Amino acid sequence: MEESSSVAMLVPDIGEQEAILTAESIISPSLEIDEQRKTKPDPLIHVIQKLSKIVENEKSQKCLLIGKKRPRSSAATHSLETQELCEIPAKVIQSPAADTRRAEMSQTNFTPDTLAQNEGKAMSYQCSLCKFLSSSFSVLKDHIKQHGQQNEVILMCSECHITSRSQEELEAHVVNDHDNDANIHTQSKAQQCVSPSSSLCRKTTERNETIPDIPVSVDNLQTHTVQTASVAEMGRRKWYAYEQYGMYRCLFCSYTCGQQRMLKTHAWKHAGEVDCSYPIFENENEPLGLLDSSAAAAPGGVDAVVIAIGESELSIHNGPSVQVQICSSEQLSSSSPLEQSAERGVHLSQSVTLDPNEEEMLEVISDAEENLIPDSLLTSAQKIISSSPNKKGHVNVIVERLPSAEETLSQKRFLMNTEMEEGKDLSLTEAQIGREGMDDVYRADKCTVDIGGLIIGWSSSEKKDELMNKGLATDENAPPGRRRTNSESLRLHSLAAEALVTMPIRAAELTRANLGHYGDINLLDPDTSQRQVDSTLAAYSKMMSPLKNSSDGLTSLNQSNSTLVALPEGRQELSDGQVKTGISMSLLTVIEKLRERTDQNASDDDILKELQDNAQCQPNSDTSLSGNNVVEYIPNAERPYRCRLCHYTSGNKGYIKQHLRVHRQRQPYQCPICEHIADNSKDLESHMIHHCKTRIYQCKQCEESFHYKSQLRNHEREQHSLPDTLSIATSNEPRISSDTADGKCVQEGNKSSVQKQYRCDVCDYTSTTYVGVRNHRRIHNSDKPYRCSLCGYVCSHPPSLKSHMWKHASDQNYNYEQVNKAINDAISQSGRVLGKSPGKTQLKSSEESADPVTGSSENAVSSSELMSQTPSEVLGTNENEKLSPTSNTSYSLEKISSLAPPSMEYCVLLFCCCICGFESTSKENLLDHMKEHEGEIVNIILNKDHNTALNTN
């Protein structure tokens, strides 16, 4: 006959002694349990004893005892209906004996007559520090004295947290108030405190109102001790608290700070204390400041106690683990627990797996991640194919999380399946369906189109409206629990780049095959990373550069009125929907904010000056947007300017105006760089060559050639002793270009799209932006500038270039490791290159630390014109000639190195294949190389469809 009893646990708090009563299934008589627990060592005891020694100078003498009654078990196995997470109230009571050791608590069983009075229902007391159990309150007091405690014990009910100093009063309360309630509980709720005289109990109730419930399934009696230790492990891992006013507080001492990196640094002081290792916030999926268990006030003690309520018996299973679902009863009204558990990083939702045999009890494991464990180098492509669209119609790029990467709490939710999207209420019993049910949660949404290997997901307008009406939309600008640092954003975007790098080849092939059939307008928006060009691959690849328009929207797509490419049958609604490819809009917002923080070159005056000049040339450029109230002004906000189209926010009016270029509708065949409008695709191609071509200035006195006029002048002055005036006069002609017409300024183009040009006062370099010319001007002022080959940024300090590369982190082909290696090599060898001749300038295939062709000043017209391709050798070409796919790489590495001036160093981005590691400085070479992996990409897609079908079955 199974005998049931209740257990009281004493839990220490900062400067206090407290106790909590929890219910526990006891299979043997109480006295036998007493002897077993006295002799059986508990691993939690050693941890708590170490804690007691650490905080012996910070404790008080007040003990708090929380009691609860539980009926006798009537069956061996029952389904688990509900359990409640109970926590200790936070209070600090000064005591004259505050220098004694921390209170350690005892367990006590009531006398047999208590069982008879309560109809076979027993109440027992348990010490949370040493697990001592007894049925006599006097034995409990004697046990507390053994811990050096002489002060009185306060009793507290574990269900409603009523406190009392009288044992009889609390016993009567448990029998009268909770006898009937224990039989009808189906869902745990925080109980309102009813004791008006105890501020301690009131504070407990206020805190428990924000604590989510934890349904737990316990294997057997032997695993209960391990289960308690696992919950305590959860508390020990929560070694810090996040206050509501935005400060982090160390629970081992009184240290407070405003940033997690400062908290991490501080944690070294507590290394080795109570299993406190160096903190990694990777596993922190709970909302900061909301799940504030008893460890929020008790340093390293038993901070969470699982309580079984009423007739809910502890189920006995043979499974290897205990599934724990943490959810909020308030959240159930808008979304189901399954949906919450699948949404990592969303407030008040968490899915964890507790293994009684493990020390690490709170490792987050999701089925989606388990199914995507990398076994090969094709993980990135699998991540992209497995991604599902979010509710705003953007593609969420799933990236692989690094061990030290940190997640933001403002991450957008994934769309669940149709049943989960309805947001209907599910009881906690229904929520615990196991991993079989969880598989359906992570299934990708059906609205995913495979466009020749380029995976584009979207949400229909009806689905978006439904989600909006259901209130499932999350505010993208809601302040997260912690801001992602620049380095974390860089790592995140680099991982996204690896996932995206396998896709461009299939999209490029289809576009080359299909776009030729479309001669109408609005085929592809000029702001996108893909542009409609009915000509050769070289010019097309130039326009495929994903970061060509960083200020014009990075990689976002605007609405298109015609079909992007031929869609599978039954999926033609893509032509009318808002299509987004590349990275999601949430990542776009992060990147734009990142660019603001890292753009150390452009001040507010520069941006406003540029925008003012552009407005004078195009007075109607932003009036349509502003007239439609696209920009929302929120007074008294940190970022008052907000874009209504994508929720991008900024604290600078110039930045928000610059951001509006993302949504600007362009004319067909309009140049995305200088607003020039061509008549047809051929004219646009010829015009684009003007922006991309390499200018070579050749000395008339010898056969030397240079990429900059300043280098030519220095050469003529030093080698041929020519004055500067003669050098300037003779350097007007040596430019070798595809044709003379392409050398004209843009003002001579379409008069309706005339935009002011900024010209360098030293050479004839021109740019549509003031910042671009200013950056270019530094080339003439520095002996050894370091140049970014993507946007033309130059600096004399290599670490500055390393920091600058953050703004390019969203490039599809951005290889973070290789770029870092190249820059580091440039730093380490910056002192040696001076002694080398131009022909011996270092140029390694894996480092690419010197590439003047890619890094020429004319290769990037401004900071927003990101041309990463190696320019072609255009000597002697005419206007009607078209570039071949290999013409952009006509320069051999040896010839490039021979053209490198001795005083210049360049850091070149590599285009990397994430499948086999192939690297090239030319995007065309990478696209050609990716054809070899076409079969592998198709296999990935087929395997994904096969796995999805298996999961569905």
From Swiss-Prot:
**Zn finger limits (C2H2-type):** 125-147, 155-185, 248-270, 641-663, 669-691, 697-720, 758-780, 786-808, 911-933
What biological-process GO terms show up in the record? positive regulation of transcription by RNA polymerase II
The primary location reported for this protein is nucleus
Q: Which UniProt keywords apply?
A: DNA-binding, Metal-binding, Nucleus, Phosphoprotein, Repeat, Transcription, Transcription regulation, Zinc, Zinc-finger
Q: What InterPro entries does its record include?
A: Zinc_finger/UBP_domain, Znf_C2H2_sf, Znf_C2H2_type
Modified residue annotations for Phosphoserine: S95, S427
SMART domains, alphabetized? ZnF_C2H2
| Localization annotation | Nucleus
Q: Which domain of life is it from?
A: Eukaryota
Q: Where is the composition biased (Polar residues)?
A: 854-888
**Region spans: Disordered:** 470-489, 831-888
Q: Does the keyword Disulfide bond apply?
A: no
Record GO terms (molecular function): DNA binding; zinc ion binding
Record's GO cellular component terms: nucleus
Family assignment?
Answer: Belongs to the krueppel C2H2-type zinc-finger protein family.
Q: What does this protein do?
A: May be involved in transcriptional regulation.
Q: Can you name this protein?
A: Zinc finger protein 507
Q: Which organism is it from?
A: Homo sapiens
Taxonomically, what lineage is the organism?
A: Eukaryota, Metazoa, Chordata, Craniata, Vertebrata
